[in-house]
């Protein structure tokens, strides 16, 4: 967290060690109804080629981030890529799948996650120590979605009320593409707010997560997709919608970008284990290798907020980590200089620290700092 903008930068500069470019404050109209896929607010980057990566058994990995997996696509920094995703367990969950079958699929990949991740994508120029800026340009879901909880009698720790919900429950929902909504049941409509539950780069060799097969002495052994970490992975942060940018530290050559665990809507907490789970015809991303930035943990920018992240098996520690990141960020920004005590107070007054999820073993908190508090400074 040691990047700063030049002292001569305008008062409207995106004030961060994380983000390097001039960004105007979002208008009231933008804050209320951001256009789908519109990045007019973002730094301008010349687009390169556009690529497509379809989902297949070759391009989609089930439950593990394997740094030795051969890249399925190589692109240049600034290129755009349209990625297709699968439903969990290599698309084996489909309308009509029973809870008994879901349980069998969960047991079929011991230690691994249920997630189907498309990738990896090798980004030329992305090197360890860089930051990969990932712009989420467009998300187009497929035709249906699902939500389920596993039976608490068999999985007593998976879900906030697992011990109170002994039976499993699964429900499927056709998606109304015109309304961008599903009907939960007559009288309840859920508008879609699609976002990738998992956006990841290649693993951090120092990730303390268990490795595939119980390997303990190989830092390049595959890591389960269950837990979020410094490389992103299963963050389940519902702010990662169209028009949002994610910044992730790079650990391996080429970045190695993956996405999956596609969601069509999720409440903060993801309390019963799953969101409105779906798959995407397309999630269009623009990865940009940033050599002018340094990060320890994922960082997010939306039209209206800067967002820090914190993860830990203990929810209190996850909160502490997210708050610390927010305080350090504010204390190092150059738009309105402040010390750590002032930053700490500011986060307490205006920071919105939310529980991302409590079901991924390593729990998540994200702290949202509103851009609007700096609007008077930008007008002066």
Segments predicted by a language model, with ranges:
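Intrinsically disordered, low-complexity linker/loop segments enriched in Gly/Pro
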Residues: 138-240
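Short, Lys/Arg- and Gly-enriched loop/turn segments at beta-strand edges
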Residues: 88-100, 139-150, 254-264, 356-358
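N-terminal, Lys/Arg-enriched amphipathic/low-complexity engagement segments
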Residues: 36-109
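Bacterial N-terminal signal peptides that target proteins for export
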Residues: 1-13
């Amino acid at each position: 967290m040691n990047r700063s903008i030049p002292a001569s930068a305008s008062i409207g500069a995106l004030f961060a060690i994380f983000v390097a470019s001039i960004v105007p404050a979002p208008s009231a109209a933008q804050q209320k109804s951001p256009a789908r896929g519109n990045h007019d607010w973002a730094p301008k980057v010349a687009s390169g080629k556009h690529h497509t990566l379809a989902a297949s058994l070759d391009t989609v990995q089930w439950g593990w981030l394997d740094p030795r997996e051969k890249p399925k696509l190589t692109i240049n920094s600034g290129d755009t890529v349209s990625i297709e995703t699968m439903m969990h367990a290599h698309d084996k969950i489909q309308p009509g799948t029973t809870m008994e079958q879901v349980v069998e699929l969960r047991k079929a990949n011991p230690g691994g996650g249920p997630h189907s991740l498309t990738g990896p994508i090798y980004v030329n120029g992305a090197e360890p120590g860089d930051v990969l800026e990932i712009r989420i340009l467009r998300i187009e879901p497929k035709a249906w979605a699902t939500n389920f909880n596993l039976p608490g009698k068999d999985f007593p720790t998976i879900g906030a009320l697992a011990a109170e919900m002994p039976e499993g429950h699964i429900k499927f929902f056709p998606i109304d593409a015109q309304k961008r909504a599903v009907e939960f049941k007559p009288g309840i409509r859920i508008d879609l707010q699609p976002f990738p539950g998992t956006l990841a780069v290649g693993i951090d060799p120092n990730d303390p997560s268990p490795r595939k097969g119980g390997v303990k002495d190989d830092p390049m052994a595959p890591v389960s997709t269950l837990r979020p970490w410094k490389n992103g992975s299963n963050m389940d942060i519902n702010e990662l919608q169209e028009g949002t940018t994610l910044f992730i530290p790079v650990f391996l050559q080429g970045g190695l970008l993956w996405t999956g665990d596609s969601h069509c809507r999720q409440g903060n907490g993801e309390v019963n284990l799953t969101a409105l789970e779906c798959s995407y015809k397309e999630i269009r991303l623009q990865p940009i290798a940033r050599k002018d930035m340094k990060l320890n943990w994922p960082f997010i920018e939306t039209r209206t907020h800067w967002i820090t992240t914190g993860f830990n098996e203990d929810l209190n520690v996850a909160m502490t980590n997210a708050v610390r990141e927010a305080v350090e960020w504010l204390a190092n920004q150059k738009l309105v200089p402040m010390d750590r005590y002032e930053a700490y107070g500011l986060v307490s007054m205006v920071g919105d620290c939310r529980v991302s999820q409590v079901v991924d073993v390593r729990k998540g908190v994200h702290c949202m700092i509103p851009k609007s508090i700096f609007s008077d400074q930008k007008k002066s």
